[in-house]
């Protein structure tokens, strides 16, 4: 599955019904939204598009963790009115949560899981979406281990429910932080790169993306959750306004990603469910200027650069 993350940190994006049409006309079968956006959820009815539904900010996460009735109310308001007409696959209890807020992840996941046990909702899986740096010792990939203890609890909960771990994987940031040791071609799926062999497993990574995903897999194994699937909940490359942020590199990376993930990684061959960040260039994004330029499309729905999804 290739999905695309539909962020709305902008003031110039098309209405949600046109966005869903743009997904469908491009053959995109997955979407991620970052809060329970009623306009997007309504527009998705009957589309068949598989959805990652984020709960929203850390305040929402804290409320869901605080007690079961808050989670039941959230499901009543944001899931029941839409499911199954909207194909909600996963609920993400937090996105790149860090610091003290991490203590809310497992309780929120448990409370949401209990609320979804109600009749007719049982196929929706609850997870959380992590930054890649939740894993440490990532080279070679087989040495990967979760950096903090709470992730072991997350992994074991996922193992018990059959839900995947949602992971944001950005070779761009790894390359930007260490261009001396990482080749651009290796980071962008371009051919002719050095391959990297893992001395512990004998497996060879042809691209940085595979090495990163397989480090997450190793961390899951080390935490006693070898059966948990990884879903790449964000990955992408900026096309402007920063180091190595060009349309050429963004196209190479995202086209390479689309063409690559059907085969999985050396450690886990087979299709890898992946969501590209992001659908649109978002002009109100804060932080580094590149944050405004991760989009596959401009707000007028024209492609930011040529790309094919099939």
Curated annotation (Swiss-Prot):
Keywords recorded for this protein, A-Z: Glycosidase, Hydrolase, Plant defense
Family membership: Belongs to the glycosyl hydrolase 17 family.
Catalyzed reaction equations: Hydrolysis of (1->3)-beta-D-glucosidic linkages in (1->3)-beta-D-glucans
Function statement: May provide a degree of protection against microbial invasion of germinated barley grain through its ability to degrade fungal cell wall polysaccharides. Does not hydrolyze (1,3;1,4)-beta-D-glucans, (1,6)-beta-D-glucan, CM-cellulose, insoluble (1,3)-beta-D-glucans or aryl beta-D-glycosides.
Subunit structure, as described in the record: Monomer.
Domain of life: Eukaryota
Keyword hit for Hydrolase: yes
Entry keyword annotation includes Hydrolase: yes
Protein name according to UniProt: Glucan endo-1,3-beta-glucosidase GI
InterPro entries linked to this entry: Glyco_hydro_17, Glyco_hydro_17_plant, Glycoside_hydrolase_SF
One Pfam short name: Glyco_hydro_17
Tissue expression profile of the protein: Young leaves and roots.
GO biological process: carbohydrate metabolic process; defense response
Its EC number(s): 3.2.1.39
Signal peptide (UniProt feature, chain positions): none
């Amino acid at each position: 599955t290739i999905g695309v993350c539909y962020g709305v940190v902008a003031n110039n994006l098309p209405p949600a019904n046109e966005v869903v049409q743009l997904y469908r006309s491009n053959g995109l079968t997955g979407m991620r939204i970052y809060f329970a956006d009623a306009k997007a959820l309504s527009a998705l009815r009957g589309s068949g598009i598989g959805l990652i539904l984020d709960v929203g900010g850390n305040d929402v996460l804290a409320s869901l963790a605080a007690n079961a009735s808050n989670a039941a109310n959230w499901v009543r308001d944001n899931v029941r009115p839409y499911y199954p007409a909207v194909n909600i696959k996963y609920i993400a209890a937090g996105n790149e949560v860090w610091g003290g807020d991490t203590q809310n992840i497992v309780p929120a996941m448990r409370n949401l899981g209990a609320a979804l046990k109600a009749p007719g909702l049982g196929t929706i899986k609850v997870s959380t979406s992590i930054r890649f740096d939740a894993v440490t010792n990532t080279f070679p990939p087989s040495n990967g281990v979760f950096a903090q203890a709470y992730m072991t609890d997350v992994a074991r909960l996922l193992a018990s429910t059959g839900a995947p771990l949602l992971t944001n994987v950005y070779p761009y940031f790894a390359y930007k932080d260490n261009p001396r040791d990482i080749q651009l071609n290796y980071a962008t799926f371009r051919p002719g790169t050095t391959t990297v062999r893992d001395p512990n497993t004998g497996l060879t990574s042809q691209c940085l993306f595979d090495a990163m995903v397989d480090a997450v897999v190793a961390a899951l194994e080390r935490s006693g959750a070898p059966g948990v699937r990884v879903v790449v909940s964000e990955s992408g490359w900026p096309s402007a306004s920063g180091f190595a942020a060009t349309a050429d590199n963004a196209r190479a990376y995202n086209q390479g990603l689309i063409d690559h993930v059907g085969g999985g990684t050396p450690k886990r061959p087979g299709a890898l469910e992946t969501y590209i960040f992001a659908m649109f260039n978002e002009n109100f994004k804060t932080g580094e200027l590149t944050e405004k330029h991760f989009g596959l499309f401009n707000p007028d729905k024209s492609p930011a650069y040529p790309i094919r999804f099939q």
